[in-house]
């Protein structure tokens, strides 16, 4: 069986116009996949040079396959049908290592055609590293490497204003573009680079903050033999992802034309502020996950897919989204409903086995950030507590007993909560405290909730009633009236 390379698999090759920091699965099934579609359907005509930003030889370089690899996109499409689509990606030309090919790295700045910089160096990547110097070959942090590359560009083209870059980080931190820009400016000042360079950074370059959304499941280790048999070639960089994707970029309106999105519309939004889209994702996608997990798991289910195929649990989650979460969010209702519909479709994806226990990690913090804001907003708007979000809190407290049908399961959270719950549930079993007292102790933890939730009218009583119902009747019976 042949391995992918451009000699045996000839096809389009594009001029290098994009630098990408990061060789991982996510960027390859997200950014490079989108660039490949735009190259095929428009005159974007842009090839990617992947820069490996860390010192590692694993996985091997994409250049071993001349930049070629296959994405397999699978899940439920807009009509709810299971689809699996294999695509040979030709947008990546080569990969270079900033550690072993530093001069080649700097030379990227000399190419007049270079226009875009994408990155995903993990959440820890956009951070300051004390001691990074201009002359390091290379510096340790990604922002320092980028500063050096930008200065190379500035110097080579004598500060030409038409030679700046559009920089689009994909790291999962709030306002990632602003954070990256601040660090680049910090290094420029720390390294005493000329004032003209700092002005050029501001005038000629755009740092765009983003929200990225796609579950990328990466190399399909268990299915490789079968998939390669179907493809007819060997691919060491096979990359799998779900059907859904969303790319929200906070940047100039002209970006849509530069990326040729006007000629081939992808699910890419160019917006003035990513905040409402971030809130939408956290509240609907992450919030639904967090509400679902303790309810579904204690109802005897193990994966998100099983939960969505269970009529009662599915109804509970959908009613929580449409009746309690969406009404308090600040975007047009039709946009929110369309996003919610995509989310429930993603939860049903038959190709992804998402274990409920793995999503349950750090459930207390997730409830505070993902559900509590909507619970409180609903109470404020209507004068009554949203029934399902409140029930989800009771289910979460019950989940920390660590026992289902007489069998224990691992609960993962910070040590404080694990010890606290162990103590509280032990006292509850020994009848030292009642259910309402247990709930009041949990909700009074100001340092965690950032407020005293026992002051929210009716909350302690409602959560205690729900918790008693779960303990006395079991999850199935307790949740049924809300389905």
Curated annotation (Swiss-Prot):
| A molecular-function term among this protein's GO annotations | mannitol-1-phosphate 5-dehydrogenase activity
Q: Which SUPFAM superfamilies does the record cross-reference, listed alphabetically?
A: 6-phosphogluconate dehydrogenase C-terminal domain-like, NAD(P)-binding Rossmann-fold domains
Biological processes, Gene Ontology terms: D-galacturonate catabolic process; mannitol catabolic process
Q: Does the keyword Oxidoreductase apply?
A: yes
Q: Which residues form the signal peptide?
A: none
The UniProt record lists the EC number as: 1.1.1.58
* Binding-site list for NAD(+): 18-29
Its cellular-component GO annotations read: cytosol
Q: Which family does it belong to?
A: Belongs to the mannitol dehydrogenase family. UxaB subfamily.
Which HAMAP family does UniProt cross-reference here? Altron_oxidoreduct
PANTHER family listed in its UniProt record:
ALTRONATE OXIDOREDUCTASE-RELATED, MANNITOL-1-PHOSPHATE 5-DEHYDROGENASE
Can you name this protein?
A: Altronate oxidoreductase
| Source organism of the structure | Shigella flexneri serotype 5b (strain 8401)
